[in-house]
Amino acid sequence: MGSNLPAQPNLRVTIIAADGLYKRDVFRFPDPFAVATVGGEQTHTTSVIKKTLNPYWNEMFDLRVNEDSILAIQIFDQKKFKKKDQGFLGVINVRIGDVIDLQMGGDEMLTRDLKKSNDNLVVHGKLIINLSTNLSTPNTNQANGLHRSNLQSSTSSGLVPQVTAPHASPGPSQLDPTASNPSLNPQRVPSTTRPSSTVAPVNGAAAPGASRTNLSSFEDSQGRLPAGWERREDNLGRTYYVDHNTRTTTWTRPSSNYNEATQRTQREANMQLERRAHQSRMLPEDRTGASSPNLQENQQAQTPPAGGSANAVSMMATGATTAGTGELPPGWEQRTTPEGRPYFVDHNTRTTTWVDPRRQQYIRMYGQNANGNNTTIQQQPVSQLGPLPSGWEMRLTNTARVYFVDHNTKTTTWDDPRLPSSLDQGVPQYKRDFRRKLIYFRSQPALRIMSGQCHVKVRRNNIFEDSYAEIMRQSASDLKKRLMIKFDGEDGLDYGGLSREFFFLLSHEMFNPFYCLFEYSAHDNYTLQINPHSGVNPEHLNYFKFIGRVVGLAIFHRRFLDSFFIGAFYKMMLRKKVSLQDMEGVDEDLHRNLTWTLDNDIEGIIELTFAVDDEKFGERRTIDLKPGGRDIPVTNENKHEYVELVTEWKIVKRVEEQFNAFMSGFNELIPADLVNVFDERELELLIGGIADIDVDDWKKHTDYRGYQEQDEVIQNFWKIVRTWDAEQKSRLLQFTTGTSRIPVNGFKDLQGSDGPRRFTIEKSGDPAALPKSHTCFNRLDLPPYKTHETLEHKLSIAVEETLGFGQE
């Protein structure tokens, strides 16, 4: 055939990219390269693209061909090229005369499915090439080779290669919302986990891109995005959009008839929905917390304290007390400090307090009242909920459960002697535990508000920067004084409402992935985890300390943040060891692969060592999980150790610096030994509160597998959920979805690990077993229980006793 070929090259072949290659290794992505061959005589090889299923080469080769020439392009994995199968990933064969007329000339773009070889190995994906008879332009492979180092990417890190966009980078007005505060620049350098198609990569990082074709990040298959908008992909390959005009991100593509005024109106409407949802959150049975929905519904039937029930609910929401009048209780005395400040001495217990024991505080009482309701509001003197009675002591079990010791009778009890016995009647055990933990937690000296005021003045449109400056300049002891928030240009005194608004707005801003400090989890698009690449901002550790202070400040002053983290984050805050189960919210694919490794014989199937590859700002490193790990093979005998080490590295070690900075700020206000009284689910509720869950909306957006909505089991399930209070519903939501967070637009926007995922109840399991949950898929496996009572009993046990965020 060679004798029939022209003396000079007459066809230029450009191997552009492959898409969706087959992943043969459980844990590693291939290092693909392509080999182009004509008649076995002319062979050209592309460069190797590291760790990706979607390599982009864009390399040109000039060949001598005729119409009968067969162009064969094979894809191999460079890691396995010396193995028996050479890491074969697919091949295409093209007869030149079938696609292009060499005499007439032309230019053809081809997309072909990859085919199997004679070994019949499974292959997958497509190959994109270009054939052209125009050889007048110089072959730019050398230039491409120089540029290609900035285009190599890793699917595992969320980077997808792309031709550099011809569009200019967004201007300073779009990328610098912190011009008023030069120290706060978390977004000045593009994040490698949130790639954008700006032209100049920073620090040699991989040139960002969010498409596998020649589209820039300012356009997609539907056309160009509105001005100021950018398309990006997260570390899981999910497309999202950045609005540089407002410094916000969204999963929804802006419409072609995008109107800024309309969008602003929609944002404000969504913000109002979120604000109302946030301000209605509360803690279970927290006597100084916000009122519960059930309490408000039964408000007319409750026994109103002086001043009316509406006033009582309002005072409960702010933790307010009525003025102290009349004589002091027996055994009490009022004294004055040298500075003239009054304090009170309780000679009964030989203790002192700043709180006037005559002041009345509103608490919730449980048990049947005269109207048959389970909840009443009563006034309770603070002195009765002050120190424990003489001879009593509060202790913790080794599982952090609060109990009380009566040294007078040498007995112990779970019941708080300061609370009426009716408080615990008919209340579930886990709920009494949480309430007691709250009482214990907030009764500690370290959690008492100090005298004086802590003034924080911020601008609404600059709340992140102003809050950073205000909170970081004050000492921890100053932050423990009564918090007084002032919004610039607005009149108003802070009796609780302003501080709630402050934490609501600030949590929306500082946890915004736009700043690269946090990113969305693998579980959904509203729970957060620390961004391991936050170091793109050189001041990131200072911001994590600031965020830790804010979280501690909210807990200290009994306010809630409108943010929710992955379950592993709460475990880390409690210094608990993370497990493979926690990996599900961080990297679902890795979780599945590690689980497969534990459940199967891996000898001769997968080749692993005690090392992992990590890419940071374009630099790829091999990290030993243990000394000399890259030389230690993983076997059936040591695979459990390997899984533990990979889990710890992926969840903890990668963000250790950031997390330690966060905890240093947090522990300045909340001592570590006190917060450890809670478990990880309770800590989520302590930080974010409990939402009022709309059961009708939940039911409306639920799918069934194996069941019909009319089935008795399903009818009983929803009856049970309706009878549960807000905390039980939130715990059920935690159990089935991994978080108590509800999307702002309700259950119709519930997300799973792979995008929108409705809540699902599946008929699965033995009626003698407990229900199971799959949090990444928002699914509840519900056995076909015969009776209403059995279903409620089994479901309650599963929800209340399960450790962590779901069982599977």
From Swiss-Prot:
One of its GO terms (biological process) is positive regulation of proteasomal ubiquitin-dependent protein catabolic process. GO terms for molecular function: phosphatidylinositol binding; ubiquitin binding; ubiquitin-protein transferase activity; ubiquitin-ubiquitin ligase activity. Coiled coil: none annotated. The active site is at C776. Pathway: Protein modification; protein ubiquitination. Residues 142-159, 171-198, 211-220, 289-303 have a biased composition (Polar residues). It is an enzyme of class 2 (transferase). Residues 199-210, 317-326 have a biased composition (Low complexity). Residues 223-256, 326-359, 386-419 form the WW domain. Residues 1-112 form the C2 domain. Interacts with creD. Belongs to the RSP5/NEDD4 family. This is Probable E3 ubiquitin-protein ligase hulA. It comes from Aspergillus terreus (strain NIH 2624 / FGSC A1156).
